[in-house]
Amino acid sequence: FWALSGGWRISNETFLRDVRWVNDLKVRLGYGVTGNNGFGNGYTTRMYKANDMWPTNGIWQPGYGSVRNVNPDLKWEEKSELNFGLDFSLFDDRLWGKFDIYHRKVDDMLYEVNAPMPPMVHDTVMKNIGSLENKGWEFELGGDIVRSKNFRYTSSLRLSHNKSKIKRLGDDGYFLDQVTFPSPGNPGTAVRLQNDVEIGQFFVYKYA
């Protein structure tokens, strides 16, 4: 995995040195790829434990059993991110802030999905199942409301906007249930992961 970033402190340039109200002005640009192997032991190599009960010829017998289903084809989840930022400090450092725009993409997402029994021993298995896109912006603005020799009072404001969307998740029409209704009677799930659908959207019945 690798990353590359750079910055330009514009306030050090000759065309801004005489602009007294600009104390600091900098732009940043970065791109990098990181990995996540967020799964524990036993997902790629079979592990066993004792004192389990397993059906044999219709009778439950004590013995050794597999801890979980294994997937020898598991690989790192990869996240790539492009980020552009602006930092500034103005009016004798009384007003400061920063602004960031980012675009992230996660490929080979790790997720535990349902598995058929048999041939699997357990009902779930960890897989690399798809890709996720995440983009948005963040803005922070702060300043000195009061500044004196013995007292200083500051305030800040933070704003952000983010969109996350599943770009690929198996075949068209495939989805994964996420959040179940708490009502009695098993009414089903309210949130799901699905191709080209923003994360967090509700899937419910429409009533007139």
Task: Give the role of each language-model region.
Residues 1-197:
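Extracellular/periplasmic, surface-exposed regions of secreted and cell-surface proteins
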Residues 201-208:
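Short, intrinsically disordered, charge-balanced linker/junction segments flanking boundaries
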